[in-house]
């Protein structure tokens, strides 16, 4: 079996996931990991799956596109071996943390926060953010891979410092 990463997006409609899983079953694919969400009416999914070695990238892509044609899915198939050595090196000796941040919805906070994470070599492995309509605020939850060199209390202090101008509150906890 060979692992492939598949990324897809389409306007959300009932039945998309059923079509995707049917196509995978047709090709004898075995799901390893997936993440799926709907954002403002658009379905998006990324997953890792093993397929028989005899199936090439084009065969997998073409079959998924054919089965999912009624949904007008945009899709890409990637070989993780091209990128995994770099990724694996980047997450060695890291600890999983969950960061919750909220505050006034003003432009610039995510940029400042992501620049801080990049400077400290912290990988953001997951993120969900939403604007709350009732009072012009935002809520965000991030999954972080902290290098062993980062002290969580110091990171929280830096987040609170850069977020002060945006009226943010932050909570950082080890991921369970």
Predicted segments, located by residue:
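A conserved regulatory-domain signal marking ACT and ACT-like small-molecule sensing domains
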Residues: 1-176
């Amino acid at each position: 079996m060979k692992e492939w990463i598949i990324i897809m997006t389409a306007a959300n409609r009932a039945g998309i996931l059923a079509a995707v899983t049917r196509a995978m079953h047709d090709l004898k694919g075995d799901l390893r990991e997936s993440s799926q969400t709907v954002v403002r009416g658009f379905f998006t999914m990324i997953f890792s799956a093993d397929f028989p070695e005899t199936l090439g990238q084009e065969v997998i892509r073409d079959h998924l596109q054919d089965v999912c044609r009624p949904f007008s899915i945009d899709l890409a198939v990637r070989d993780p071996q091209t990128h995994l050595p770099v990724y694996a090196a980047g997450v060695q000796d890291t600890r999983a943390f969950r960061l919750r941040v909220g505050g006034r919805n003003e432009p610039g906070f995510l940029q400042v926060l992501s620049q801080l994470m990049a400077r400290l070599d912290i990988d953001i492995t997951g993120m969900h953010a939403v604007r709350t309509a009732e009072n012009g605020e935002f809520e965000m939850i991030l999954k972080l891979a902290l290098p062993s060199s980062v002290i969580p209390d110091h990171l929280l202090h830096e987040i609170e410092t850069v977020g002060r101008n945006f009226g943010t509150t932050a909570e950082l906890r080890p991921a369970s």
